[in-house]
Amino acid sequence: YATLVHRAQGQGYIVHLVYFWLNSPRLAKERVADRVSQGGHNIPADVIERRYTLGIRNLFGIFIPIVDEWMIIDNSLLRQEMVAEGGMGKTIKVYDENKLTKIKEYGK
C-alpha cells in the first residue's frame, strides 16, 4: 500500500492514517471470536498473531514516515483513547507514553 500512498500524494491528495490499536493479540482473538459468534467470518489464531505484529511493524517502518498525518488510537476499551499523532513536518504529540512504548515493543 505504500505505492498507493505515494500515488495519491502525487495526485495532490493528503493521506491520513488512523491506526486502531488493541492492547494484545489475545484481545484481537477475543474480538474475532465474538464476531464469529454473531455470524461473522473467522480468522485463525496464528494469522491474528502474525498480523498483529506485522501491522505494528508496518505502521512504524513503512506508513508513519510517508503519510501526511497519522494518529494511533487505543481501541481496547469501550472508550477510545488517543495515544499519539503526528505527520510530515509536524511535531509528534504523545498523549500516553506508556502505551506508545508498549505498541513499539510489540512491533519488534
Feature roles, as predicted:
Residues 10-59:
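A glycine- and Lys/Arg-enriched "phosphate-lid" helix/loop adjacent to the NTP-binding pocket
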Residues 1-2:
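Short, well-ordered alpha-helical microsegments
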Residues 6-9, 64:
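Anion (oxyanion) recognition and catalysis
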Residues 61-108:
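NTP-dependent small-molecule kinase module
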Residues 8, 15, 70-72:
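Generic structural hydrophobic/aromatic packing signal, biased to beta-strands
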Residues 5, 59-60:
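Short amphipathic alpha-helical segments and helix-helix/interface helices
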